[in-house]
């Protein structure tokens, strides 16, 4: 009889302990900031960021998903100014969101780089001008990372720059900036997903023609890479 009571006691104690651990897990607060163009094309059914939300929202300790601070045609310097000025959308302040977020994706750099390359022909005569411009974008991103790190102590993933100019001659510039950014993120303990290489693996990941967009297949490929990183960097540490 005493043994039965002991077994029942241990059983319910175990249930209470498991419930306590689950209820005291840190909330998963997921945010993406930066450029909206990467995932706003009307040719896709669901973008990679929303696919991540779909998976994270199934967790008992899911908190929030913020994509308020993604914009069309935003530059890195604009993002820096937004943080400095603590801009708000419907009384949601960017500094507060960054402080509360523990899974953060940053997407910036594509707008200004692709705009520059669309205005300047890719040839040896223009190489210096283009590389100098890439270095300036890099400096802005470095400042942005410093601002974000001052506010955020969570896991951060930076999305690399991909070639949406439709011109393969520009690949050398994307390889150059991605290598610099990869080293920068590594030195700041930020994970890096190089979209240039991810999207170049399959011709179905990008549309054809002058206006290049990421397809459904491309978004799923990015989602798979990102969610695996989120699982490795954050989710499994909560077990």
List the model feature ranges, each with a label.
Residues 1-5:
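Positively charged n-region of N-terminal signal peptides that target proteins for export
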Residues 6-19:
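Hydrophobic membrane-insertion alpha-helices, especially the h-region
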Residues 15-16, 51, 221, 225:
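Short amphipathic alpha-helical face segments that pack within enzyme cores
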Residues 18-26:
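Sec-dependent signal peptide cleavage junction
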Residues 25-27, 154-155:
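Short hydrophobic/aromatic-rich motifs at helix boundaries and adjacent loops
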Residues 28-31, 37-124, 128-139:
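Conserved SGNH/GDSL esterase-like catalytic core that processes O-acyl groups on lipids
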Residues 88-239:
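Alpha-helical cap/lid subdomain in secreted, periplasmic
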């Amino acid at each position: 009889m005493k043994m039965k009571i002991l077994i029942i006691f241990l059983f319910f104690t175990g249930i209470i302990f498991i419930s306590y651990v689950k209820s005291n897990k840190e909330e998963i607060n997921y945010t993406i900031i930066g450029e909206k163009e990467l995932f706003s094309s009307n040719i896709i059914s669901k973008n990679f960021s929303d696919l991540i939300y779909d998976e994270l929202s199934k967790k008992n300790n899911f908190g929030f998903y913020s994509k308020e601070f993604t914009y069309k045609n935003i530059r890195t310097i604009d993002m820096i100014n937004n943080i400095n000025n603590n801009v708000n959308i419907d009384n949601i302040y960017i500094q507060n969101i960054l402080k509360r977020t523990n899974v953060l994706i940053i997407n910036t750099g594509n707008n200004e780089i692709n705009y520059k390359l669309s205005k300047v022909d890719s040839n040896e005569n223009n190489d210096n001008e283009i590389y100098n411009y890439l270095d300036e974008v890099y400096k802005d991103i470095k400042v942005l990372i410093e601002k974000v790190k001052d506010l955020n102590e969570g896991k951060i993933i930076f999305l690399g720059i991909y070639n949406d100019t439709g011109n393969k001659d520009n690949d050398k510039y994307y390889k150059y900036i991605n290598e610099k950014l990869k080293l920068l993120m590594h030195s700041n303990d930020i994970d890096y997903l190089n979209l240039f290489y991810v999207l170049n693996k399959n011709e179905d990941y990008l549309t054809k023609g002058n206006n290049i967009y990421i397809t459904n297949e491309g978004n799923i490929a990015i989602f798979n890479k990102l969610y695996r990183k989120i699982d490795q960097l954050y989710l499994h540490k909560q077990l």
